């Protein structure tokens, strides 16, 4: 099964017995995705998954996420990278531990995100 996921996600390693820490940052992220996707979980939680990942790996992972989402899986992730938001159907903006905005993809703009992130709450 590991070889199948290595090929599907294009993890670059000759030996599947290598420690994950011996892989590049992008391949470590791919290995973590493979582990999550190999489960039967319908909701996958990700914490800033593209931090430190090269552009090519990001595109590979985004394609994989879209493919899995079309099959009914849900991906919920925290990100600090606004370019990742292009891959989201819905975006929630948090401030002080609470949701201050819920934006559909069609209404998503950087201005709305910044305003929601820093605007003072109405009295």
Where are the regions a protein language model picked out?
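Glycine-rich phosphate-binding loops of nucleotide-dependent enzymes
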Residues: 1-123
């Amino acid at each position: 099964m590991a070889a199948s996921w290595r090929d599907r996600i294009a993890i670059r390693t000759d030996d599947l017995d290598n420690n994950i820490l011996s892989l590049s940052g992008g391949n470590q992220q791919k290995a973590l995705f493979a582990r999550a996707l190999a489960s039967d979980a319908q909701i996958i939680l990700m914490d800033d998954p593209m931090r430190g990942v090269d552009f090519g790996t990001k595109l590979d992972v985004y394609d994989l996420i879209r493919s899995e989402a079309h099959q009914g899986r849900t991906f919920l992730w925290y990100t600090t990278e606004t370019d990742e938001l292009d891959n989201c159907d819905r975006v929630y903006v948090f401030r002080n531990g609470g949701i201050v905005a819920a934006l559909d993809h069609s209404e998503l703009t950087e201005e709305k995100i910044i305003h929601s992130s820093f605007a003072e709450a109405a009295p």
